UniProtKB/Swiss-Prot annotation:
Protein name: EARP and GARP complex-interacting protein 1
Subunit structure and binding partners: Interacts with two multisubunit tethering complexes: EARP composed of VPS50, VPS51, VPS52 and VPS53 subunits and GARP complex composed of VPS51, VPS52, VPS53 and VPS54 subunits. Interacts with SNAP29.
Classification via SMART domains: WD40
Residue spans of the WD repeats: 132-172, 180-222, 226-266, 270-310, 345-385
Gene Ontology annotations for the cellular component aspect, listed alphabetically: trans-Golgi network
Provenance organism: Macaca fascicularis (Crab-eating macaque)
Length: 387
C-alpha cells in the first residue's frame, strides 16, 4: 500500500503564517501569509486538488505589512484576520485587522502555480482591531463554531474580546483582562476551547499556561512552569474537554488535564529544537502534529490519552463467534503511543503546521523559506483507525 508523495509549493518570500480556510468543509484550501520587508506582502490562497495531486493558487496583496499570524473566520469563507508589522515614528508596531477577500476567490481557483502572468488582487479592509492602547498583537483567535462575530486578540499582556458588527466593518471591544505580576509579561499564543459552550480560552505567556472564562474574563486555571522555556503554542483536544497540548522552546510537547495541572499527563521529546506548533486532528484526536525549527514535522499517535484509547470499538452484535475471542483480547489492551512518521521535506525552520478543515487525513506545513508542503496520514494507519 503505497502512500502518496508530498506535494510542495514554493512562495518567493519568507513566510511563517498558515491557516486552513476554516469555513470551507468541501474543498482543501489553505491561506499562507508572507514576511517581506522590501516588497508588498501577499496572502496565497492554496487549493489542493487531491484527485490529481496538484496545487492551484491565487495571490492577494497584503500591503499593510509583514504577516506574523493569520486566522480564518469559522463562518464566512471570505473573511480572515491578520497580525502584521508596521513602522510608526521609527517604532515597529504589530497591528491586527479583519479583511475580506474578493468574492470570486472565496471558493478557490483553477490557476496553476506557474502562471505568473496574473495580477494579484487586493484585500478589502473590514476593520482594524484598534490597538492604540496596546501595541503588540500576538494573535487573533475566532470563536470556534461561532457565527464569526466574536474574536479574541492577544496584545502585550491583554486579552481583548471583540464583537464584530455591521458585517464585520466595525469591531467593538466587549471586554478585556490583563496579566498582573512583575516584569513585562507578554502573551505569545492563545486558543479558544470548542467545549463548555465556547466560554474558555487558554493562553501562553513565558513558561506559563492560563485558562480564562470569557464571560467574566477571569482566570480559571494556571500551569506555572509548564515548560522549561518559552511556550510557543497550544491546542485543545476536540473530543476531550479537559485536555490541552502545549509545546515550547524546551523541545517538548506536553499534554495536560486542566482539572489537575500539577504535572502533564504525557510528554513527548522527539524534536531537537524549539517546537513552534502543535495541532490535534479535528476528527481523530489521537493524531497530533508538531512542527519545529529542527526543520521536521512529526505526526504522533497519542492513542492512550485519546477519546478512543482502545481503538475503534465494535458493538457486540456485530461480532461473529470466531471474532469474539480475538476482539475481546484486543479491547482489553490500550494501544501504544508512538511516532507515526517524521516528515523531512523542509530545509528551514517549520513555523506552522495545520490540518485541512475539509479532509481529516491531510495537513500542511510551512517553513520560513516559503516552502509549503502538503502531506497525508499514512494509508495503513488511516485504515487501522477507520476499520
Amino acid at each position: 500500500m503505497e502512500d502518496d508523495a508530498p506535494v510542495i509549493y514554493g512562495l518567493e518570500f519568507q513566510a511563517r503564517a498558515l491557516t486552513p480556510q476554516t469555513a470551507e468543509t468541501d474543498a482543501i484550501r489553505f491561506l499562507v501569509g508572507t514576511q517581506s520587508l522590501k516588497y508588498d506582502n501577499q496572502i496565497h490562497i492554496i487549493d489542493f486538488d487531491d484527485e490529481n495531486n496538484i496545487i492551484n493558487k491565487n495571490v492577494l496583496l497584503h500591503q499593510a505589512g509583514e504577516i506574523w499570524h493569520i486566522s480564518a473566520s469559522p463562518a464566512d469563507r471570505g473573511v480572515l484576520a491578520t497580525c502584521y508589522n508596521r513602522t510608526s515614528d521609527s517604532k515597529v508596531l504589530t497591528c491586527a485587522a479583519v479583511w475580506r477577500m474578493p468574492k470570486e476567490l472565496e471558493s478557490g481557483s483553477h490557476e496553476s502555480p506557474d502562471d505568473s502572468s496574473s495580477t494579484a488582487q487586493t484585500l478589502e479592509l473590514l476593520c482594524h482591531l484598534d490597538n492604540t492602547a496596546h501595541s503588540n498583537m500576538a494573535c487573533v483567535v475566532w470563536e470556534p463554531m461561532g457565527d464569526g462575530k466574536k474574536i479574541i486578540s492577544l496584545a502585550d499582556n491583554h486579552i481583548l474580546l471583540w464583537d464584530l458588527q455591521e458585517s464585520s466593518s466595525q469591531a467593538v471591544l466587549a471586554s478585556s483582562a490583563s496579566l498582573g505580576g512583575k516584569g513585562q509579561l507578554k502573551f505569545t499564543s492563545g486558543r479558544w476551547s470548542p467545549h463548555h459552550n465556547c466560554t474558555q480560552v487558554a493562553t501562553a505567556n513565558d513558561t506559563t499556561l492560563r485558562g480564562w472564562d470569557t464571560r467574566t474574563m477571569s482566570q480559571i486555571y494556571c500551569i506555572e512552569n509548564a515548560h522549561g522555556q518559552l511556550v510557543r503554542d497550544l491546542d485543545f483536544n476536540p473530543n476531550k474537554q479537559y485536555y490541552l497540548a502545549s509545546c515550547g522552546d524546551d523541545c517538548k510537547v506536553k499534554f495536560w488535564d486542566t482539572r489537575n495541572v500539577t504535572e502533564p499527563v504525557k510528554t513527548l521529546e522527539e524534536h531537537s529544537h524549539w517546537v513552534w506548533n502543535v495541532r490535534y486532528n479535528h476528527s481523530h484526536d489521537q493524531l497530533v502534529l508538531t512542527g519545529s525549527s529542527d526543520s521536521r514535522v512529526i505526526l504522533s499517535n497519542m492513542v492512550s490519552i485519546s477519546s478512543e484509547p482502545f481503538g475503534h470499538l465494535v458493538d457486540d452484535d456485530d461480532i461473529s463467534d470466531q471474532e469474539d475471542h480475538r476482539s475481546e483480547e484486543k479491547s482489553k489492551e490500550p494501544l501504544q503511543d508512538n511516532v507515526i512518521a517524521t516528515y523531512e521535506e523542509h530545509e528551514d525552520s517549520v513555523y506552522a503546521v495545520d490540518w485541512s478543515s475539509a479532509d481529516p487525513w491531510l495537513f500542511a506545513s510551512l517553513s520560513y523559506d516559503g516552502r509549503l508542503v502538503i502531506n497525508r496520514v499514512p494509508r495503513a494507519l488511516k485504515y487501522h483507525i477507520l476499520l
